[in-house]
Amino acid sequence: MKITVIGAGNVGATAALRIAEKQLAREVVLIDIVEGIPQGKALDMYESGPVALFDTRVSGSNDYRDSADSDIILITAGLARKPGMSREDLLQKNATIIKEVTSQVMQYSKNPILIMVSNPLDVMTYVARQVSGLPEERVIGMAGVLDTARFRSFIAEELQVSMQDINAFVLGGHGDSMVPVVKYTNVAGIPITELMSIEKINAIVERTKNGGIEIVNHLKTGSAFYAPAASAVEMIESIVKDRKRILPCTTCLKGQFGIQNVFCGAPVKLGRKGVEQILEINLSADELKALQQSASIVEQNCRNLDALLG
């Protein structure tokens, strides 16, 4: 198993290290356009192997040819958000970057699974699919896992219980229009509505929607990277080990939830082939409407890029 990570910034480097530490691949390649950065970080990671107890070969490069024959390619390249900048502000600039990155990696790997982390996430997943020509089930966006992790952590913090006992789904686009599904949220099987007032639930939903911005405002000069990297690696682990985890991921919906040909967050079964099944769970009327509105925003942003994609 060979996994390439595009982008040696905070998210990419953290993800590469977690992949190595979990020994999910025999080889991890970290690629970035800045000379010396991927090489230095990769060497540092590799030298941690004896004490972190892994034998994965980690290398860095500025040459896409070193990504050849990758099984999974994690794309984290792109501009990070700054305070006051929405994900949509990044649209045109990052779409150009992702178009180039995808074109490059597809020259050297025949049928990889692409996992997108770059923002605006849902739209960049669409760009990668259009440029790569890969089957839709092999181009997946990391959004719902991260948003759900934030939702779960906030609930656990409020209730003072283990995060491991919080079960939840956050669907829809990765942004202000995401849809935390309260109906399927429980604590060790106990419905969240029996443990928390609607007012507190709604406050946590709003905090989840602004989870990324909250971190950006703290950091001032960067954005979240530990949780995004961990979320991406959770997806990779399910694929590599063919665990068939049910995870909320950005995928191309084909009529599910009344949404047609739009990349949007939904519960999927994630295995060795990528997205092996989309689970069309029952939603309340309000949740379904919110999900469809979220998908509509993603679709409009995708249409705005059609000229760029040709």
Swiss-Prot record:
CDD domains: LDH-like_MDH
Keyword Protein biosynthesis: no
Reaction equation(s) it catalyzes: (S)-malate + NAD(+) = oxaloacetate + NADH + H(+)
Binding site for NAD(+): 7-12, 32, 94, 117-119
Keyword terms of this UniProt record: NAD, Oxidoreductase, Tricarboxylic acid cycle
Single GO molecular function: L-lactate dehydrogenase activity
Class of this enzyme: oxidoreductase
SUPFAM superfamilies, sorted: LDH C-terminal domain-like, NAD(P)-binding Rossmann-fold domains
Gene Ontology biological process terms from the UniProt entry: lactate metabolic process; tricarboxylic acid cycle
InterPro entries hit by this protein: L-lactate/malate_DH, Lactate/malate_DH_C, Lactate/malate_DH_N, Lactate_DH/Glyco_Ohase_4_C, Malate_DH_type3, NAD(P)-bd_dom_sf
Recorded family membership: Belongs to the LDH/MDH superfamily. MDH type 3 family.
HAMAP family for this protein: Malate_dehydrog_3
Alphabetized PANTHER family for the sequence: L-2-HYDROXYCARBOXYLATE DEHYDROGENASE (NAD(P)(+)), L-LACTATE DEHYDROGENASE
Name under which the protein is recorded: Malate dehydrogenase
